[in-house]
Amino acid sequence: FYPGKNLGALGDAGAITTNDEELVQVLRALRNYGSHEKYQNIYRGVNSRLDELQAAVLSVKLKYLDAQTARRREIVDVYLQGIKNPNLILPLPVDKCVQEFAEHVWHLFVIRTAHRDELQKHLQDNGVQTLIHYPVPIHKQKAYTHMSGLSLPITELIHDEVLSLPLGPTLTLEEAWKVVSACNSFRVGSI
């Protein structure tokens, strides 16, 4: 429930669901310093309890989640229908055969282009804010130096191409069409 997520708290928060009762007991201890009883640690745990303030905020925000998700889908529809630039690769909508079982909630709208940095500058010059989420591939993170020798060409290609367009329940359709217009006016080598 990171604040920037579709259902976000005021600060970091999270939840785990399971139907495994044994796992429930372990997880409850792990979130409470590894303990079921005060000062009786049976695991190396952490303080990961959801405090009352975060729970209250999430409870209120949950009431608006469906409407906000519908708004995100409206914006995505504008993007999918409007962006026609052949230099941009758009995300695919949920496949028809999967729609019976799944719906996309569109946390992010991530496009790809071989000219990402140029596009980002062009969009910025046109008043469109973008983000590069997760700018360093996992296998190149310091914590994973044991993987640094791996050859992951698809990961690295995608890493160099991804760009997140604005998407959120407060974005107006007019603003979404402005994003579309800016994307469509991008020309390779124009910057």
Go through the PLM ranges and name each one.
Residues 19-191:
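PLP-dependent aminotransferase class I/II
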Residues 3-9, 15-17, 164:
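Active-site phosphate-binding strand-loop segment of PLP-dependent enzymes
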Residues 1-9, 37-42:
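Conserved active-site segment immediately N-terminal to the catalytic lysine
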Residues 7-11, 102-105:
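Short glycine-enriched loop/turn motifs at secondary-structure junctions
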